[in-house]
């Protein structure tokens, strides 16, 4: 854990704040007229996924947490755990469903994802997917002919079980490029 000040804040870094690990989503240095300067922060909890907003005095000490990303292959789900394999040592590592969180919507077996570790404690704090994944449509409704006056969307179930909105021309069996940050359809592959 490295001590720093609010001047060391950057988007994306992880800090220990109120006994929890948070990723800095956004920050802004504010210096109102004749008041003391402060830093407004938007932080995302790595344990709950909840986003909070808070402010601290400018120059205040913060604990910057060093994190590591290690590529791992997702193997399978076993009860309330997900089993990953280290690509270098071939060790199998169970990760609880709480730490995987929403990433499960777009995780396909045998795909490589990044496990995020707290480098000081060598503990897993989360799972990061690639920004884009290619997934197959296993179920969708048939588009109604002539219903193309506007951008019509319909629900489609992907091979991972996730349901997303797709354009009317998408059919079962199509492979789609999905943005894992937003869960939105990008293009047909």
UniProtKB/Swiss-Prot annotation:
Biological pathway: Protein biosynthesis; polypeptide chain elongation
Segments passing through the bilayer: none
Family recorded in the similarity comment: Belongs to the elongation factor P family.
Pfam families: EFP, EFP_N, Elong-fact-P_C
Main location: cytoplasm
Nucleus is among the record's keywords: no
NCBIfam families for the chain: efp, PRK00529.1
Keywords of this entry: Cytoplasm, Elongation factor, Protein biosynthesis
Descriptive protein name: Elongation factor P
One GO term of the biological process aspect: peptide biosynthetic process
Function per UniProt: Involved in peptide bond synthesis. Stimulates efficient translation and peptide-bond synthesis on native or reconstituted 70S ribosomes in vitro. Probably functions indirectly by altering the affinity of the ribosome for aminoacyl-tRNA, thus increasing their reactivity as acceptors for peptidyl transferase.
Originating gene: efp
Gene3D superfamilies: 2.30.30.30, Nucleic acid-binding proteins (2.40.50.140)
Superkingdom field: Bacteria
InterPro entries on file: Elong-fact-P_C, NA-bd_OB-fold, Rib_uL2_dom2, Transl_elong_fac_P/YeiP, Transl_elong_KOW-like, Transl_elong_P/YeiP_cen, Transl_elong_P/YeiP_CS, Transl_elongation_fac_P
């Amino acid at each position: 854990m490295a001590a720093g000040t609010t001047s060391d804040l950057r988007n994306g870094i992880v800090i220990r704040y109120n006994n929890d690990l948070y990723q800095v989503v956004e920050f802004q240095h504010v210096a109102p007229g004749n008041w003391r300067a402060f830093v407004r922060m938007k932080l995302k909890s790595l344990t709950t996924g909840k986003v909070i907003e808070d402010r601290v005095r400018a120059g205040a000490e913060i604990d910057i947490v060093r994190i590591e990303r290690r590529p791992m292959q997702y193997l399978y789900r076993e009860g309330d755990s997900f089993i990953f394999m280290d690509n270098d040592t071939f060790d199998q590592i169970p990760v609880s469903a709480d730490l995987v969180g929403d990433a499960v919507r777009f995780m396909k077996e045998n795909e490589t994802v990044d496990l995020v570790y707290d480098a000081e404690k060598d503990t897993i704090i989360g799972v990061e997917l690639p920004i884009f994944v290619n997934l197959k449509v296993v179920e969708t409704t048939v588009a109604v002919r002539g219903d193309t006056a506007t951008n019509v969307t319909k629900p489609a179930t992907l091979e991972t079980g996730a349901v997303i909105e797709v354009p009317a021309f998408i059919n079962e069996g199509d492979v789609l490029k999905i943005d894992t940050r937003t869960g939105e359809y990008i293009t047909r592959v």
